[in-house]
Regions:
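Cap/lid segment of the alpha/beta-hydrolase catalytic domain
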Residues: 1-32
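Alpha/beta-hydrolase fold nucleophile elbow
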Residues: 47-59
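The feature captures the conserved acid-bearing segment of alpha/beta-hydrolase catalytic domains
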Residues: 92-151, 157
Length: 194
């Protein structure tokens, strides 16, 4: 992902900082880059002979996997895990990112309605998924405060109430992770494995 790990900007206070440091237009640009990067990986995998690809991601990776499922028909299944689908609505609860966004908004006199409209460009809620309903599974934690369960529920509603798995836990502590990993395996068994 852009702005994460070795792709973080020098001096970033935390991994992923760059997603928020440049406002929501920067966020949209970073998401477009993430989609481009992943589609390049799909190209490479197909070139090497891979004929089936399922996609999962956690947190912003869940957002990204949901977005990619709306733009690339080569994906056989998608499983967003603790996805955030409206970061503009949840960023107020994300410390320290919320302080950066608050300062940027104050200094630039940013209109909240304009911000909401700007985030629609890269929102998976703005596009119909290309992955069939029976190949979509959303996983979320009941106690998640970084990606509140309401975020996953919004995606679930948008995706025609596809398969959904709740786990006890939060964004960091995935209690019963083996349960949802087994669910993922069962979910993909018929179309991903011979």
């Amino acid at each position: 992902m852009p702005f994460h790990g070795s792709r973080a900007e020098k001096g970033s206070p935390f991994s992923g900082y760059g997603f928020f440091a440049h406002g929501f237009s920067g966020f949209a640009e970073a998401m477009a880059q993430a989609v481009h990067d992943f589609r390049s990986i799909i190209d490479y995998l197909e070139f090497t002979g891979v004929d089936r690809i399922a996609l999962t991601g956690m947190s912003l990776g869940g957002y990204t996997s949901a977005l990619i499922a709306s733009v690339d028909d080569r994906i056989q299944a998608v499983i967003p895990n603790v996805p955030v689908v409206t970061p503009d609505q949840t960023v107020d609860e994300w410390f320290p990112a919320n302080k950066v966004v608050e300062l940027r908004s104050r200094l630039s006199h940013t209109d909240s309605e304009l911000t909401k409209a700007a985030t629609l460009y890269s929102s998976p809620l703005n596009y119909q998924p290309l992955v069939p309903k029976d190949r979509r599974l959303i996983i979320t934690g009941l106690g998640d405060r970084l990606a509140p369960p309401e975020q996953a529920e919004m995606l679930w509603e948008h995706w025609d109430r596809c398969a959904f798995h709740w786990f006890p836990g939060n964004h960091i502590l995935h209690v019963s992770q083996p349960d949802y990993l087994r669910r993922m395996t069962r979910f993909m068994r018929d179309f991903m494995f011979d």
